[in-house]
Amino acid sequence: MKGEFQKRAGFVLLACLAAHSDGIPDEQFRRYLPVLEWGATDERNFVQKGVSWALRMVGLQSPGMRRACGKLAQKLAKSDRASARWVGKEALREFERKR
């Protein structure tokens, strides 16, 4: 259980950075997309929620990041892993609402 919350904490920090920091270049956030893709395959509920939050917040940074995160969300939504599908679909719903 401890590792689950440590892993979630990393994703939550990324979400908070994206939500509360202005002026960070897209390239800084783009580096974390492979990490988000990797984290989305974790079946643990709290980790999934952390990844979902981070992906959604990073995607709201700029139009370019929305496109990049949207592509990742579409890829995850088609995954054969249930956790990745959930993260992808959740992010796509958020991006549709925020248009």
Name the predicted role of every residue range.
Residues 1-99:
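Alpha-helical scaffold domains
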